[in-house]
């Protein structure tokens, strides 16, 4: 799904790799953006595991087994609190999924979302939003200060 990104993955990763920050990437499809649901790809599952956030391989299928994780959408001037639901549905062999509450307010289909873990929360950066990517270079902005705190 990453190949559908409307933004250069290499440029986005340069920011996080330069800071030594582990990052998971997601690219919502039109349906995924509309429903706020995305497949948790293998590379994203690896990020969640390595960050100590979640291990899908230990999770049973069905709504009773979903795990809710605090998350934040990062904007240049603020963070918007939300939640991420990590689950394996009863259908489709239980392929791992992630659902962010209010995702439709934060991105468009094919936007590149970079996710980091900090202080037990998931921070979501829309790397297709130039206001957000430009803010990484501005001390005092949320993207800059969060990334600096993670170094």
Report residues per predicted region.
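Intrinsically disordered, charged low-complexity linkers and terminal tails
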Residues: 1-151
């Amino acid at each position: 799904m990453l190949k559908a990104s409307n933004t250069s993955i290499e440029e986005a990763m340069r920011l996080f790799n330069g800071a030594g920050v582990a990052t998971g990437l997601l690219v919502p499809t039109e349906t995924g953006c509309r429903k706020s649901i995305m497949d948790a790809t293998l590379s994203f599952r690896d990020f969640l595991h390595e960050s100590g956030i979640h291990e899908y391989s230990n999770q049973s299928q069905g709504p009773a087994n979903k795990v809710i994780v605090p998350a934040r959408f990062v904007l240049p001037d603020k963070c918007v609190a939300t939640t991420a639901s990590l689950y394996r549905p009863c259908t489709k062999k239980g392929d791992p999924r992630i659902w962010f509450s209010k995702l439709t307010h934060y991105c468009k289909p094919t936007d590149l979302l970079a996710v980091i873990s900090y202080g037990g929360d998931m921070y979501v950066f829309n790397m297709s939003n130039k206001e957000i990517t430009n803010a990484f270079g501005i001390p005092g902005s949320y993207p800059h200060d969060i990334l600096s705190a993670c170094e």
